Amino acid sequence: MSKEEQYQKLCEINRVEGFDPAAFAVEYTDMNTGEVRKRLPVMIQMAWFRLKYPEGRIAVEVTPAKDCFVAKARVYPSYKDGLECYLAEATASRGPDPAHPSVSPREWAQTAAVGVALRNAGFGLQFGA
């Protein structure tokens, strides 16, 4: 199998007939490197996940820490799956941002953890866009 054929196979991960996630890609600037990249908004990732796994579950736990909140998200293909039977897991921490005082650090941490967990489960633009 050629490299191009293998790439096409990778692009079929979590394929849903009639849905093209690349159409929803937005540009953002990486906070660490300043590099402009493309990503999917978390709401689109969640919608894609629901299309692929209608009975799926996204579990989030948030813990307050010193000057921030730490969120852990796990993605399950079925709401019936046991705690350790998840597709992917991610954590994120966020504190107050003086430049955006109206942004809740708790919600920001939750959203970041969910987005990374979904990306780790294959609901992202890791293979193109």
Label every model-predicted segment:
Residues 1-43:
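N-terminal, Lys/Arg- and Ser/Thr-rich interaction peptides
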Residues 46-129:
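Positively charged, aromatic-enriched nucleic acid-contacting surfaces
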